[in-house]
């Protein structure tokens, strides 16, 4: 079966990763030791996409946990599902990257990367037919962004034909953890544009908004945010983990979602989002799910798709859903909001169905959108980047690790190019094809 190897790097990546494993273990009927106690054949049928069956019926996640300091790892190991993971797959340094991309990418991280690759290789060899990798990390810190992108490029070299999906927590406009976030994020995006096949952008601020507005939590903790992210990750991977009518794998998803190779940064959403304890008071319908799923307030990245247009999007419905009803709803959305979809890609909404709903819900839907409005996010980071870079603020932390200013300039211009590519396709219409055909090759010659 088509296996996926999961890699989590840095503090943020490990916390999201831990929440993800907790969620999908529950969906597959595994307890915190990886022992199966479920009731449905469907839970077992594709278990091996994410789990390796060890002896005595224990299922072990195909997960590699990486960090440059032991703290987060110890927390994962001591957490509710700490006994699930293979002990050899915890790889950590002692020094920490100190929110410095250069440390994660060039010095501290580079020392550890070979150990990590050995473990990844071993996991990959245990697969019948490896489909690809997924990485959870944040772009604002040092380890997840610097070492995460280093791992991605190394894996790319070694497994050039496998898919690479990343769940990347991007810095948010108002909530900032560190001053140098714009540097770390820009340097990471520079790598992701080249090396990732699909990047799901998640943003803490949007998650805070969802927690406060929709889930009515007065002061959300990271646990609540991670719960949202794991719901989306579980939704995106649902077609890979359960047999369904319309199955997709990472590659099919990419084929449907990425019209131009560099434009693979997706916005994600999830429905129904109800406050814990409220969902038992109402039944959810497909029209409601669709409505909520396309609601800007539900997007987990703080850019408003009403300022741009969708190139493509994909919706994944789970539960007992009628195919016909879903298709009608999708057609309905497209007709009502036709201005938000580019007209030069017909049928740009893809739908997938899976009969098994998440725990505690009758139905749910996950949304993945490739919208040109994601450029807002890159623009925002880019402005913060150039404000600091112009004054060479904090630059000595990076040059001290052997980086060159040239790299910063390159990363900045690559990100600006990305923004203008999104803008170009946002404005493109059907009628002006001729001029684009001449321009297009020049755009993508990197």
Swiss-Prot record:
Identify the residues that bind GTP. 11, 69, 138, 142-144, 204, 226
Kindly list the cofactors needed. Mg(2+)
Its annotated compartments are:
Cytoplasm, Cytoskeleton
Biological process (GO), any one: microtubule-based process
Q: Detail which positions bind Mg(2+).
A: 69
InterPro entries, A to Z: Beta-tubulin_BS, Beta_tubulin, Tub_FtsZ_C, Tubulin, Tubulin/FtsZ-like_C, Tubulin/FtsZ_2-layer-sand-dom, Tubulin/FtsZ_GTPase_sf, Tubulin_C
Molecular-function annotations in GO:
GTP binding; GTPase activity; metal ion binding; structural constituent of cytoskeleton
Composition bias of kind Acidic residues appears in 429-440
- Region feature (Disordered): 426-446
Q: List, alphabetically, the CDD domains matched.
A: beta_tubulin
> Superkingdom of the source?
Eukaryota
A single Gene Ontology CC annotation of this entry is:
cytoplasm
Q: Gene3D superfamilies in the record, alphabetically?
A: Helix hairpin bin (1.10.287.600), Tubulin/FtsZ, C-terminal domain (3.30.1330.20), Tubulin/FtsZ, GTPase domain (3.40.50.1440)
- Principal location class: cytoplasm
List UniProt keywords, sorted A-Z.
Cytoplasm, Cytoskeleton, GTP-binding, Magnesium, Metal-binding, Microtubule, Nucleotide-binding
Pfam families the record matches: Tubulin (PF00091), Tubulin_C (PF03953)
Cysteine-cysteine disulfides: none
Q: Which family is this protein grouped under?
A: Belongs to the tubulin family.
Self-association and partners: Dimer of alpha and beta chains. A typical microtubule is a hollow water-filled tube with an outer diameter of 25 nm and an inner diameter of 15 nM. Alpha-beta heterodimers associate head-to-tail to form protofilaments running lengthwise along the microtubule wall with the beta-tubulin subunit facing the microtubule plus end conferring a structural polarity. Microtubules usually have 13 protofilaments but different protofilament numbers can be found in some organisms and specialized cells.
- Please give the function described in this protein's UniProt entry: Tubulin is the major constituent of microtubules, a cylinder consisting of laterally associated linear protofilaments composed of alpha- and beta-tubulin heterodimers. Microtubules grow by the addition of GTP-tubulin dimers to the microtubule end, where a stabilizing cap forms. Below the cap, tubulin dimers are in GDP-bound state, owing to GTPase activity of alpha-tubulin.
Output this protein's name.
Tubulin beta-2 chain
